[in-house]
Amino acid sequence: MNNIIKMLNEEQMKTDVPQFGAGDTVVVKVRVVEGGKERLQAFEGIVIAKRNRGVHSAFTVRKISNGEGVERAFQTHSPIISSIEVKRRGRVRRAKLYYLRERSGKSARIREKLATK
């Protein structure tokens, strides 16, 4: 029984998910159905939380839109996610960046992680 569940979970997992973590700026392309048409909508922001649980993995992205903070939680292996692109790597010392909710402007900035040679 346990092997069957494990096999089904592995079957549903995507293989094209890039490596990213809290502090990284990502662009998530989401499939949106409006009327009868399907289009891709980009959601760009900072990853403030990531949960690694196999097929149940999820992450939360936060962005500032018109001066208002917007957060959206995504299931990593969901079929509505078309692609995930990492724009920039952030250097942070926490796994969850919930403290960014209370901050704005310069205090909400995240240092960039420079690539090592």
From Swiss-Prot:
The keyword Ribosomal protein applies. Keywords: Ribonucleoprotein, Ribosomal protein. It holds the Pfam family Ribosomal_L19. SUPFAM superfamilies: Translation proteins SH3-like domain (SSF50104). The keyword Ribosomal protein applies. Belongs to the bacterial ribosomal protein bL19 family. This protein is located at the 30S-50S ribosomal subunit interface and may play a role in the structure and function of the aminoacyl-tRNA binding site. This is Large ribosomal subunit protein bL19. It comes from Shewanella pealeana (strain ATCC 700345 / ANG-SQ1). The gene is rplS.
